[in-house]
Regions:
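Basic, Lys/Arg-enriched alpha-helical interface segments
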Residues: 1-66, 108
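Enriched for short, Lys/Arg-rich terminal
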Residues: 67-108
Length: 108
């Protein structure tokens, strides 16, 4: 059975995302922010069943998977795979400057 391990930084970022989404009024109800982040957690926990690709740059993990949360936002989850363990190293989205470094051969 596969095991999903999230680094503390990833958990912190997702927990902070709940507050950011609500405070910046992306969602009118805090419950909607919780649901949005829970959907990301659900996706992460399904990593073993998903098609994933090698990252172009290994700084934050060997592999990545993309999760399309809505028509405007795609999340990129990077991880290492060690046997039956998936170790989630980092999460970012297409609204950041850093995400192309995971999916293309851009020099850092």
């Amino acid at each position: 059975m596969e095991k999903i391990i999230l680094l503390p930084e990833v958990i912190y970022k997702l927990n902070e995302l709940i507050n950011i989404l609500y405070e910046k009024e992306y969602f009118g109800f805090i419950e909607s922010s919780f649901k949005y982040v829970n959907d990301i957690y659900d996706f992460i926990h399904s990593l073993p069943t998903l098609h994933y690709k090698e990252t172009a740059n290994k700084k934050f993990g060997e592999y990545y998977c993309s999760y399309k949360a809505n028509r405007n936002t795609t999340w990129y989850i990077t991880f290492d795979k060690k046997g039956d363990r998936f170790i989630v190293q980092y999460i970012t989205n297409n609204h950041t400057e850093e995400y192309p470094y995971f999916i293309s051969k851009i020099q850092q």
